[in-house]
Amino acid sequence: MKVSAVLKNARVSAQKARLVADLIRGKSVEQALNTLTFTPKKSAVLMKKVLESAIANAEHNEGADIDTLKVATVYVDKGPSLKRFTARAKGRGNRIEKQTCHITLVVGN
């Protein structure tokens, strides 16, 4: 039994979110929650939210036992980027791309 949760358009770059995803891949759900709680990164907060959602989905929809759940797969895909402009010298402007990503997390036993 595999249950997933997805967070789309998270306002963090995919490269930075993958650093946190690598920390929890393959761990038990309880270990992953502890790891994410004490990881001082913005993407850790987002990843914890997705993990808690996946746990709730497994418990409510499938009636799964939380103690046996593991993080089966977690991957981060690049999302659409927000284009912004910042003022530069002599009336010019530079484009700034604010990156987003899609976080997909699957738990199972």
From Swiss-Prot:
One of its GO terms (biological process) is translation. The keyword Ribonucleoprotein applies. PROSITE patterns: RIBOSOMAL_L22. Keywords: Ribonucleoprotein, Ribosomal protein, RNA-binding, rRNA-binding. Pfam families: Ribosomal_L22. InterPro entries: Ribosomal_uL22, Ribosomal_uL22_bac/chlpt-type, Ribosomal_uL22_bac/org-type, Ribosomal_uL22_CS, Ribosomal_uL22_sf. One of its GO terms (molecular function) is rRNA binding. GO terms for cellular component: cytosolic large ribosomal subunit. It comes from the Bacteria. NCBIfam families: rplV_bact. Belongs to the universal ribosomal protein uL22 family. This protein binds specifically to 23S rRNA; its binding is stimulated by other ribosomal proteins, e.g. L4, L17, and L20. It is important during the early stages of 50S assembly. It makes multiple contacts with different domains of the 23S rRNA in the assembled 50S subunit and ribosome. The globular domain of the protein is located near the polypeptide exit tunnel on the outside of the subunit, while an extended beta-hairpin is found that lines the wall of the exit tunnel in the center of the 70S ribosome. Part of the 50S ribosomal subunit. This is Large ribosomal subunit protein uL22. It comes from Laribacter hongkongensis (strain HLHK9). The gene is rplV.
